[in-house]
């Protein structure tokens, strides 16, 4: 079947098979992450010419040197974040908007009353990608649960701080100070740290008394976090692929 003839039912079945695989492989461990990934149509968050690849477990290019993360990484980061309904989340690196939509389905589930909803704020430094994410989220039905901001994600988004959870989808040389400041006591951050050749995904916890505890959980490979508290443009070109 040609990619352009695939219909909604085909994508729904492909999504179901992918989610079942991620459950078997241990990336999806909770019912709420499973439900979120079954509900969010990844085919609406990739370029049209790549829609037929939406349910391959691989990153896909979305333009401007950026990618949409592989589904297993989205599942893993969402599980490590330990999201709950009603939480306020900051995502650094909106990309295509897919990961924000998955998180929105956890913190603001479609079948829950609006008064119980949390919200996802996602910040993107590339204006064209921010607009791409905004359009994708709107057509997928998440515009009222996700706010897209154009800006330097390494500085966070203090206007809506503090956050219960912060998810960073680009690799930083170290944990940006503003993100630590904007994390609630008792909150968690999931962030890739490292250079071009060696990165690890870290889970960072701010304890109730404000102490910071962090632990690496898995090797990974992300595009660079470019910004005042990340990599400079010229460093990103030579430090991270």
Curated annotation (Swiss-Prot):
It is an enzyme of class 2 (transferase). SUPFAM superfamilies: S-adenosyl-L-methionine-dependent methyltransferases (SSF53335). The keyword Nucleotidyltransferase does not apply. InterPro entries: PCMT, SAM-dependent_MTases_sf. Its EC number is 2.1.1.77. GO terms for molecular function: protein-L-isoaspartate (D-aspartate) O-methyltransferase activity. It holds the Pfam family PCMT. The active site is at residue 69. Its main location: cytoplasm. It is found in: Cytoplasm. GO terms for biological process: methylation; protein modification process; protein repair. Keywords: Cytoplasm, Methyltransferase, S-adenosyl-L-methionine, Transferase. HAMAP family: PIMT. Belongs to the methyltransferase superfamily. L-isoaspartyl/D-aspartyl protein methyltransferase family. Catalyzes the methyl esterification of L-isoaspartyl residues in peptides and proteins that result from spontaneous decomposition of normal L-aspartyl and L-asparaginyl residues. It plays a role in the repair and/or degradation of damaged proteins. This is Protein-L-isoaspartate O-methyltransferase. It comes from Hyperthermus butylicus (strain DSM 5456 / JCM 9403 / PLM1-5).
């Amino acid at each position: 079947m040609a990619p352009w003839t695939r219909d909604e039912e085909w994508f729904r079945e492909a999504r179901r098979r992918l989610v079942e695989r991620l459950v078997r492989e241990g990336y999806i461990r909770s019912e709420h992450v499973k439900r979120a990934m079954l509900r969010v149509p990844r085919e609406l968050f990739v370029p049209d010419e790549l829609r037929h690849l939406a349910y391959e477990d691989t990153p896909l290019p979305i333009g401007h040197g950026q990618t949409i993360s592989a589904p297993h990484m989205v599942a893993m980061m969402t599980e490590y974040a330990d999201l709950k309904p009603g939480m306020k989340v900051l995502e650094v690196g909106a990309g295509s908007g897919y990961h924000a939509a998955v998180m929105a389905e956890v913190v603001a589930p479609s079948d829950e009353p609006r008064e119980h909803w949390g919200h996802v704020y996602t910040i993107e430094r590339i204006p064209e990608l921010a607009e791409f994410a905004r359009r994708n989220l709107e057509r997928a039905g998440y515009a009222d649960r996700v706010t897209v901001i154009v800006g330097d994600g390494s500085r966070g988004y203090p206007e809506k701080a503090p956050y219960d959870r912060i998810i960073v989808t680009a690799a930083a040389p170290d944990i940006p100070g503003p993100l630590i400041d904007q994390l609630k006591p008792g909150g968690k951050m999931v962030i890739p740290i490292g250079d071009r050749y060696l990165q690890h995904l870290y889970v960072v916890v701010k304890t109730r008394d404000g102490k910071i505890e962090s632990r690496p959980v898995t090797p990974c490979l992300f595009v660079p976090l470019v910004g005042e508290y990340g990599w400079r443009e010229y460093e990103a070109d030579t430090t991270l692929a």
